């Protein structure tokens, strides 16, 4: 680089600085490259900037120094010679007198300090300059930042792994003195983070720290407790927690601070603010963790007294929280998440462990003192919860401490008693020692079964513990719900204790839970036992199957009227057993499979018994729910499991539907069982689908004894459900033949078919048109001239299959159906058929991880609604005949009934007048649909409701009265909407209708339905209280 080029570069940098910093930075990099390649020297840059340095213009002097510093910062640390470093150092030193350049000079020193050939003498001189000449109170935060950066760079260069050299010893004390000077009075959060970090580095690495420990501690603790609220749009993203953590880390960096830290923190512990108290406790916790046993030995008495006071005065939790055994499981190990109470316990835990590791004799003295102070609480049953929590916290330290705590504590309270109050206290307090055991030895898991744990004193009390809990659960009165619930919870927690219980003891607990859940009607006992069985099944699934599930399944009789008794208890209902099976087998692999297999076998026997329809329904519902609840969980039902289940239960199910049984003769049971057949095929390996399709076609269509296309057969619904589960890409040569045959069968026999038979064939049309038959072939079967009911139904169901796959032709077909709404003879019928287009079919929906079973698009309802809405609205507005108007409104309302509310939002302004008119339609279903949409509109469009409140309120009042078309649902939703209006419409509007609503609803108080009377009372109460100021 020539001198002219250098001058040009300097001019470019100066011109772009603070305007285009990227360009200025690029120019500085170019100059640095020339220095590195030795085409110019850094001193030449100084010469080139000479005129700017001497300028009377302050801005030019600043820019010139920034230019030099930027180039210097980019220069490699080992490039400048000793002489160059010395000259540059002296140059920056000469600029110190120029107060306007303070920030730029400090930046220059920060760039120079890491240079390899800057001598220790010059570093000492720099530190002395900062100590003597730098007055932090005269500068802004952005300038005060640089001394911290200078100190950090000096520290990183000389003190990291180098504090023993003689050279470094020369600046050790000077460095600390300079830091104390620079850090004094700092308030900027960014600078404080650097200050705290430097303080920690000094106390962790430098020598002679003990000579400065009071000053170093004071320059930290003056900020405690730190409070900082970051400003909006803070560019540094510094949080209050960042500062707290940094300060805490610095305070606990050296045991030299122990004496000052403990005394000052214990003073702060008396603060009334919970936030300050929490910060103090968390800092104390870190002090105990890091300062070690020797500092605790000197301070444990003070710490114990302060912590004991906090714990005894501020107990957290009560009986209700103890009744939830999962609270502790959900706690975080993050220090920042400790409550004040938990932090006190954790400090005591660490104090004990640190003392034990430091000096066992001192620990003995500490523990004896603590136990002597707490023993009276056991005698007088005072503060027992806090007492046991303190002792269990101490016991969580290590095995030896745990054994000492157990052997000293259990004899004081683990005494069997028949007194309810004492037994409750015993069980509640025992819980804390279970937590201590789990903290120390770990939690039981499938992987840890059989892994031994160290010998411990609690094991010696195991038989006594089990006996006490067993008696509390099985011998207590049914009215003693709390005692019995607590015993279930403690048994559940004991299951989690690694290596504590033998399989035989676990089996006994499973037996207790199973018997209690069967014989006790209290919901607390039920859910406690249920959660217990779920917890046990996560670890001991085989035992739960053998002892609990088998017993439950074996209790199911073949005859519905047969009485079921357990332990001579009163008759247990079949519904209760099936509900228990459903509730606790969820997501457990073996339990789900075995339940389905057994229940299918039981169903096969029960179905052959006359008058067993209700029992069959219960069994089929349970099987269906087990499939439906676990179908998408690969850990419970994978492809291999699905195939094994199919092979195990499908022959039994087909035996039921192909012979005379209580299921074939019951339409609802048959439909539900057909849905079970859908699930048995849904997740089997795809490679098996083609073979299964061929087999089912032979059975239902061609060679089997069912042959649903020959004459009407109720099993068409089973065939349709099975087809819904199979891969849409399977080869199905006779698909159109089946489709055509189904259409012909419907047209010929529909008048004589039962409703279930007809729906079975119609759903078969839907499945075929959606996933097997081409769009062209489906449309080819449409006969728009035939306006018979059955032909219209056939076309609607075929169209539904196309709509669900977002067929391009479906929009045009829908418009033809809209045209039929104006037909005086069939318009009313067609309007009701519009619901078919969007109603859900359970076997034709999307399942997670399964994309091959149908062509249903997720957003097909939204698309269909968008296709038909404007046409329906336009036709409605252009029609004079009220009957035809009613058809359009009915069609729209029934589509709205199944359309997601978020899809309706964009159309609400056009839709709202139609909703109000739909409320007068002579059809309860239309009214319900309109009310449901209006309910959603009220929730989301407050202004629109307010504008029309004068119309809405009288309408709703009329709909709340008994009337031919005001069904229970209509009346209930109308009352709910009246109540809802008061929450979204301004008070002054609502007050004008207060009297009208209160008087108009008086007759509704005598409605025949209790649910209507209750809602009416709630609605009237809301209007009665309008404008009143509630009492606090």
From Swiss-Prot:
Role this protein plays: Key component of the cytosolic iron-sulfur protein assembly (CIA) machinery that mediates the incorporation of iron-sulfur cluster into apoproteins specifically involved in DNA metabolism and genomic integrity. Acts as an adapter between early-acting CIA components and a subset of cellular target iron-sulfur proteins such as RAD3/XPD and DNA2, thereby playing a key role in nucleotide excision repair (NER) and RNA polymerase II (POL II) transcription.
Cellular compartments annotated: Nucleus
Protein name: DNA repair/transcription protein MET18/MMS19
Effect of residue 930 to T: In strain: SK1
Effect listed in the UniProt record for changing residue 814 to S: In strain: SK1
Listed result of changing residue 335 to M: In strain: SK1
KW Phosphoprotein (keyword) present: no
GO biological process, one term: DNA repair
Cellular component terms per the entry's GO annotation: cytoplasm; cytosol; cytosolic [4Fe-4S] assembly targeting complex; nucleus
Keywords in alphabetical order: DNA damage, DNA repair, Nucleus, Repeat, Transcription
HEAT repeat feature ranges: 862-901, 905-943, 946-988, 991-1029
Additional remarks: Present with 3150 molecules/cell in log phase SD medium.
Main location: nucleus
Top-level lineage group: Eukaryota
Family annotation (SUPFAM superfamilies): ARM repeat
Family as reported in the entry's similarity comment: Belongs to the MET18/MMS19 family.
């Amino acid at each position: 680089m020539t001198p002219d080029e250098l001058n040009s570069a300097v001019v470019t940098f100066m011109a772009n600085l603070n305007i285009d910093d990227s360009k200025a930075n690029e120019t500085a990099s170019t100059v640095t490259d020339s220095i590195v390649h030795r085409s110019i020297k850094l001193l030449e840059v100084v010469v080139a900037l000479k005129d700017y340095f001497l300028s009377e213009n302050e801005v030019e002097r600043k820019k010139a120094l920034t230019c030099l510093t930027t180039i210097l910062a980019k220069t490699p640390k080992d490039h400048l010679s000793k002489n160059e470093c010395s000259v540059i150092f002296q140059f920056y030193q000469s600029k110190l007198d120029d107060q306007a350049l303070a920030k730029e000079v400090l930046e220059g020193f920060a760039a120079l300090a890491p240079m390899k050939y800057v001598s220790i003498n010059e570093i000492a001189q720099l530190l002395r300059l900062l100590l003597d000449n730098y007055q932090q109170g005269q500068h802004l935060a952005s300038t005060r930042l640089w001394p911290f950066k200078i100190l950090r760079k000096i520290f990183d260069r000389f003190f990291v792994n180098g504090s023993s050299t003689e050279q470094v010893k020369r600046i050790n004390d000077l460095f600390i003195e300079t830091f104390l000077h620079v850090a004094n009075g700092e308030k900027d959060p960014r600078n404080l983070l650097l200050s705290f970090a430097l303080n920690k580095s000094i106390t962790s690495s430098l020598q002679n720290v003990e000579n400065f420990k009071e000053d170093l501690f004071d320059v930290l603790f003056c900020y405690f407790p730190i409070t900082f609220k970051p400003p909006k749009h803070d560019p540094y993203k510094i949080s209050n927690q960042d500062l707290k953590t940094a300060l805490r880390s610095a305070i606990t960096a050296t045991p030299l601070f122990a004496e000052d830290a403990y005394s000052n923190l214990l003073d702060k512990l008396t603060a009334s603010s919970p936030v300050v108290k929490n910060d103090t406790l968390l800092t104390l916790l870190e002090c105990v963790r890091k300062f070690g046993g020797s500092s605790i030995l000197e301070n444990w008495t003070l710490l114990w007294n302060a912590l004991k006071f906090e714990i005894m005065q501020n107990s957290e939790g009560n009986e209700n929280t103890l009744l939830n055994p999962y609270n502790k499981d959900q706690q975080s190990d993050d220090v920042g998440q400790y409550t004040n109470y938990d932090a006190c316990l954790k400090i005591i835990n660490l104090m004990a462990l640190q003392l034990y590791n430091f000096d066992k004799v001192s620990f003995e003295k500490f523990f004896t003192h603590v136990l002597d102070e707490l023993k009276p609480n056991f005698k007088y049953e005072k503060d027992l919860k806090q007492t046991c929590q303190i002792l269990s916290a101490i016991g969580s330290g290590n095995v030896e401490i745990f054994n000492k705590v157990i052997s000293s504590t259990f004899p004081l309270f683990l005494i069997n008693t028949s007194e309810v109050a004492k037994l409750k206290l015993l069980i509640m307090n025992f819980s804390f020692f279970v937590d201590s055991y789990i903290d120390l030895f770990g939690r039981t898991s499938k992987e840890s079964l059989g892994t031994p744990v160290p010998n411990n004193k609690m094991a010696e009390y195991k038989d006594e513990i089990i006996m006490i809990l067993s008696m509390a659960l099985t011998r207590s009165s049914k009215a003693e719900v709390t005692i019995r619930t607590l015993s279930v919870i403690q048994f559940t927690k004991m299951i989690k204790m690694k290596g504590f219980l033998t399989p035989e003891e676990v089996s006994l607990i499973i037996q207790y839970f199973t018997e209690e859940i069967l014989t006790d009607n209290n919901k607390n006992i039920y859910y406690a036992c249920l959660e217990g069985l779920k917890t046990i099944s996560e670890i001991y699934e085989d035992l739960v199957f053998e002892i609990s599930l088998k017993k439950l399944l074996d209790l199911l009789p073949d005859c519905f009227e047969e009485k079921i008794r357990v332990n001579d208890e009163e008759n247990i209902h079949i519904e209760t057993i099936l509900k228990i099976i459903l509730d606790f087998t969820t997501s457990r692999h073996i339990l789900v499979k075995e339940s389905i297999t057994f229940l299918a076998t039981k169903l096969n026997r029960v179905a052959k018994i006359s008058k067993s329809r209700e029992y069959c329904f219960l069994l089929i519902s349970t099987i269906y729910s087990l499939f439906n609840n676990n179908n998408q969980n690969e850990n419970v039902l994978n492809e291999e499991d699905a195939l094994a289940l199919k092979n195990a239960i499908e022959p039994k199910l087909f035996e039921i539907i192909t012979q005379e049984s209580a299921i074939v003769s019951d339409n609802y049971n048959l439909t539900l069982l057909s849905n079970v057949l859908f699930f048995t095929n849904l997740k089997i390996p795809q490679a098996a689908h083609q073979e299964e399709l061929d087999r089912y076609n032979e059975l239902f269509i061609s060679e089997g004894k069912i042959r649903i296309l020959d004459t009407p057969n109720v099993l068409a619904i089973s065939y349709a459900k099975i087809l819904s589960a199979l891969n849409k890409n399977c080869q199905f040569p006779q698909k159109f033949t089946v489709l055509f045959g189904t259409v012909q069968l419907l047209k010929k026999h529909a008048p004589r078919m039962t409703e279930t038979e007809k729906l079975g064939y119609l759903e078969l049309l839907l499945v075929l048109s959606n996933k097997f038959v081409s769009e062209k072939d489906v449309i080819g079967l449409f006969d728009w001239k035939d306006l018979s009911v059955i032909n219209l139904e056939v076309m609607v169901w075929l169209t539904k299959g196309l709509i669900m796959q977002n067929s391009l032709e479906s929009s045009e077909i829908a418009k033809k159906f809209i045209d039929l709404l104006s037909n005086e003879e069939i318009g009313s019928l067609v309007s009701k058929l519009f619901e078919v287009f969007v109603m859900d079919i359970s076997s034709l929906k999307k399942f997670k991880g399964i994309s091959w079973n149908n062509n249903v698009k997720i957003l097909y309802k939204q698309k269909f609604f968008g296709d038909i809405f404007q046409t329906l609205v336009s036709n409605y507005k252009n029609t004079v005949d009220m009957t035809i108007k009613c058809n359009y409104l009915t069609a729209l309302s029934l589509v709205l009934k199944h359309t997601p509310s978020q899809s309706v939002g964009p159309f609400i302004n056009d839709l709202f007048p139609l909703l109000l008119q739909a409320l007068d339609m002579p059809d309860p279903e239309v009214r319900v649909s309109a009310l449901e949409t209006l309910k959603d509109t009220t929730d989301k469009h407050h202004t629109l409701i307010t504008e029309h409140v004068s119309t809405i309120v009288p309408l709703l009042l009329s709909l709340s009265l008994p009337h031919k078309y005001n069904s229970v649902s209509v009346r209930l939703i109308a009352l709910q909407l009246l109540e809802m209006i008061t929450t979204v419409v301004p008070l002054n509007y609502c007050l004008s209708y207060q009297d009208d609503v209160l008087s108009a609803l008086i007759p509704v108080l005598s409605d025949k339905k209790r649910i209507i009377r209750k809602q009416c009372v709630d609605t009237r109460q809301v209007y009665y209280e309008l404008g009143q100021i509630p009492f606090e």
